[in-house]
């Protein structure tokens, strides 16, 4: 299903659709946008509209999906030690934000910041919350860059010297779900990259 993660109806509908297939055991939140914008750019100050849009999708959308999924997970019987696992997606930009990433870094920093309190709140319901902070990954956002730019970015990752792949992300999700003691943590999935200021 497709939808606007900033709309609560979308979150409710997504959870209801998932429940038609059976209990909701895992939520992977990975919708996001990376709208560039400096605090003060060529066209003047960063607009509240741009900031609000990025925060609405990357942060509010994440929280909305978490809330709807957690409500469904709380109502179901545990499977092993868990009723469910919520995996959120932040970014290394939450830690190493570059010039021009004010809105994006703020939105992903908020996802990092809410991980522990959400895990603590949901612990009594046997629901775990873990966040992945990907580095330079092969994503639709990255696909919009020229090939030369993607190649240059791939050399910035120390090891392996490439862009992260969707399979790398999926493997970490699988590991998070299968490890019942992993909770309230943010895991960098970045090949040891640290973003430069520009």
Can you describe what each PLM-predicted range is?
Residues 2-13, 48:
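The beta1-alpha1 cofactor-binding region of Rossmann-like NAD(H)/NADP(H)-dependent oxidoreductases
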Residues 12, 34-52, 71, 75-80, ...:
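Conserved mid-core segment of classical short-chain dehydrogenase/reductases
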Residues 123, 128, 182-185:
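Short, small/polar-rich loop/turn modules that mediate ligand/substrate recognition or access, typified
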Residues 91:
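Residue(s) in the substrate-gating loop at a strand-loop-helix junction
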Residues 165-189, 194:
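C-terminal substrate-recognition "lid" of short-chain dehydrogenase/reductases
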Residues 54-56, 148-168:
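Catalytic Tyr-x(3-8)-Lys segment
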Residues 66, 107, 115:
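Active-site helix of classical SDR
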């Amino acid at each position: 299903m497709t939808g606007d993660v900033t709309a609560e109806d979308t979150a409710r509908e997504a959870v209801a659709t998932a429940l038609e297939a059976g209990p909701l055991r895992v939520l992977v939140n990975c919708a996001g946008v990376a709208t560039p914008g400096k605090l003060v750019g060529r066209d003047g100050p960063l607009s509240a509209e741009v900031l609000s849009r990025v925060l609405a999708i990357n942060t509010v959308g994440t929280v909305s999906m978490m809330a709807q999924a957690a409500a469904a997970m709380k109502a179901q019987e545990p499977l092993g030690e868990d009723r469910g696992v919520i995996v959120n997606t932040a970014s290394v930009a939450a830690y190493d934000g570059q010039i021009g990433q004010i809105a994006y870094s703020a939105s992903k920093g908020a996802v990092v910041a809410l991980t522990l309190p959400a895990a603590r709140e949901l612990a009594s319901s046997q629901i775990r919350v873990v966040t992945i902070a990907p580095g330079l990954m092969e994503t639709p956002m990255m696909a919009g860059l020229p090939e030369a730019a993607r190649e240059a970015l791939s050399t910035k990752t120390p090891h392996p010297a490439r862009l992260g792949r969707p399979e790398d992300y999926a493997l970490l999700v699988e590991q998070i779900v299968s490890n019942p003691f992993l909770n309230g943590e943010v895991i960098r999935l970045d090949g040891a990259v640290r973003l430069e200021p520009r």
